[in-house]
Amino acid sequence: TTSCTDAKGKQYRTADGTCNNVNKPTVGSSMDKFKRDVKPQYDDKKGDPRTKGRCLYKTEKGCYRPDLPSARAISVVVHSKQTSVDDDSSKSSAVSPKMPSMGNLQSLGNLLSLGSVPVPAPAPAPEPVSAPSVDIAPAQPVAGPSITDLLGLMSIIQKPKSKPKPKPKPKPQPKPQPESKPILSQGAIGDILGLLGTLVASPEKETPVSSQPDDSISGLMGKVDEPRIRTPKKSPRKKARQSIFRRRDDRKDDRKGLRGTKGRRDDSDDNDDSDDDDDDIEVRISNVFATAAIKFVAALSPDYIDIRGRKIRLRDTYNNPEMVFDELPELIEEMLQQPTEERNRFISKELTDHFLEDGSRSFDEVASIIQRGRDHGVPPYNWFRQFCGLPIVRSFNSRVFGDAGPYLRKVYKSVDDIDIYTGAMSEPNLPGSLLGETFSCIFARQFRDLKFGDSFFYLSDDPLRGFSKEQRRELDTITLSKAMCFVFGLEAVQMNPLRVPSAQNPLSDCEQIPSFFSFLEDPSEGPRSNLLSRVSQSESVASLSGIMPRFFDAESAGPSMKDNGYEGVGNVLPPAFTTNGVSKTVVGASPRGSERFRDVEVEDPEGGFGMPLPGVPIPSMSSNTDAVSQGDPLNELTQMGGTVDGEVEVEEPEIPGPQEGKASGSLPRAFTDGRQMPLGSSPGSLGGVQGSATQPDALDPTILPGVPLDLQPKAQDPTKLPGVPEYLQPKPKSSGLSTQGAVGGEMGKGEIELEDQLGSHGVAGGAVEVGEAEGAAGGIDGSVGSGGMGGSVGVGGSGGMGGSVGVGGMGGSVGVGGSGGMGGSVGVGGMGGSVGVGGSVGSGGSGGSRGAGGSGDDGDDCCQDDSKCSDDEKQKYCKNSDTK
């Protein structure tokens, strides 16, 4: 018995799926039985596959129940393209003008049923378990045709009028579903009827013994740098679809192709097994869904696939995994471009006559589906129409069957004997749907169960298990098209991959498709998305000077972030992130509206640190041509640049001094001692908190507020930029600057001393001593350091902004010594500030060891006076040194 005592209130689901519903611990767990929507029908009412039809009339010996037609006969007569009434192949080969091959949603079926269904476990007998009473036509029910079998079935074998003497039937053994074991679906029929003979039983009689030495668990895992597919029996098309979802878990489903659920929302109202209470909805896959409904995708498979002009028959793709490994991108492109078959009752002969073909042997996938349903005791078609509240079909001439009625009459004795798969596949599609009314009902109920029965569903309102509104908005930005670009390295894809390209669904460059993962993409590995391209599509770039992500909004912030009249809206940004240095800008909004920014165009230059980082605002920009001198490195390596007449220009925002009481911007709660503090002040500079500034609620000063843990900077190396991917870290340059000391260093003729009582990443901190940097190109002498908040410091003596803004340090992030122009300017919790511009960067404790500003001639004194430096320094700085 499974106990869920410890599972209550847990944030994440268990590994095996138990305790999703604490009142029904095993429902929906691994190895759980399928759900029964309708009472099963077995020949012996216990477990023998259904082989007899309904009672047609009474006799002296009882009720006469005719034999059901062979599954193979049904496949050939009803589902084969060769049996069209007027031999009109135009209907059977029609293609959908909208849906590409990707649109068959086979991947959905593989995700839900995983390509396998449980069947009753075989008895421990040396021979295959069989049903001796099964009367089979001259062709096997699931095996593909030999010439004689095919021709015999095409004309439909007439049974003799005299019934053969029935063979003695062994006493049936109950085989309830709870004892079922999942095995590969293609072998299910063979294990029961002994017809396929393709599985080798293991000594434990539970799973087949693999004849392939590579079929170990390690072989099934797949390597990171190769497609994660290890199913050689599957079609490469199916494997490619699986690969997309196994590499990218989060995505938005396009369910328009399965439309038809509209109007089915109240299906459960007419059935006793349903309840409006979510706790009573079982998050399980129904038997009919796994064995029949999801198999509708077989009708969407074409006869061949076209890869770069090569037409490859589907039969030639079986047992050919190399095709996926070698040509996966080409296969994906084909799936996106080639229209799929129109969904109707006709199935390609590649699946009915040549499925898994090996020499002279093949199988019929449609016959397997039909026979599998009988093995599972799935009731006939009419039972499910009644279950869905649809009118029962009483005649083969019913309009419900479209033009399939005459062919159904050829194989079935009664409409009540029609198998659910054949009957539902014969229905015309509902408007705008891939399904008829019966399968639409089954799909709608299944999706309802998965959504409302799952206590961990991502739209759950549970405050612990569900996502916040902001997280949902971010999830909504993830698209299947971008996932395909990211996974397969495609150059272009239509915005909706489940529809063929058209004027309404044009191909889009992968670089232009919005993506939440854009900052994780490596430019060296293919196309990457650009945050600013997304902004340019949705915002007025003419008035955009900066934008903050939703991470820092009020709902996820502490109480101290809701003030200054913005209660419930967001925090007031520090002046460095606003348009004029003093304006109050709400987090999540763009500081725009000032006339002086109307003509600024925002762009992301190629190279350098052009990729935007989460939590780093776009610096203010203006058309002030004096802001950056000609030849400044900022023109090439600006993190977020503005262009005016082709030149990158950045304006230094006004920075208020560390004057207590002048709170033009409030620091986030994580960076204060719990109360509002003036911008630029440090916890160590205010009375009562000297040397003892603690984070409220045990907040880690190195953790950025509102930023997901997987996006937090991992590196603690002071020479590395926090929050910046390794491939974006600045490369060491021979700048001639000294790198002596964990904090501090030399630049030009001046010395910069930075002191923090608790080290380069301290919290409490103390006074900040900033020396004058002679030879520096202007800047703010002594800058703004907020000594103590993580070794924070704006380092003076730099050009332009001069070490710019140490906004309370924000986690040891800022303090770019000797940088030109912006000099790494703005730091937000360690994720920014250090992203220097122009190769400038020393982050936190590095104290401006690699700056691009200042006089740039460190070592002149050394070269002019031998007594001022060592031989190593001479060799490093002096071009004409004898020791070099």
Swiss-Prot record:
Extent of Basic residues compositional bias: 160-172, 230-245
Domain of life of the native organism: Eukaryota
Pfam families xrefs: An_peroxidase (PF03098)
The keyword Secreted belongs to this UniProt entry's keyword annotation: yes
Chain intervals with Acidic residues compositional bias: 268-279
Keywords, ordered alphabetically: Secreted
Disordered, as annotated region: 1-53, 78-188, 204-279, 653-695, 710-744, 828-884
Cellular component, GO annotation: extracellular region
Biological processes, Gene Ontology terms: response to oxidative stress
Pro residues composition-biased segments: 119-129
Compositional bias (Low complexity): 91-118
Comp. bias regions, Basic and acidic residues: 32-53, 246-267, 865-884
Keyword Secreted belongs to the record: yes
Organ and tissue specificity: Component of the acid-insoluble and acid-soluble organic matrix of calcified layers of the shell (at protein level).
Location of this chain's protein in the cell: Secreted
UniProt xrefs under InterPro entries: Haem_peroxidase_animal, Haem_peroxidase_sf, Haem_peroxidase_sf_animal
Molecular-function GO terms, alphabetical: heme binding; peroxidase activity
Family matches, as Gene3D superfamilies: Haem peroxidase domain superfamily, animal type
Gly residues compositional bias, start-end: 828-856
Biased composition regions of type Polar residues, renumbered to the chain: 17-29
Family named by the database record: Belongs to the peroxidase family.
Protein name: Peroxidase-like protein 2
Record organism: Lottia gigantea (Giant owl limpet)
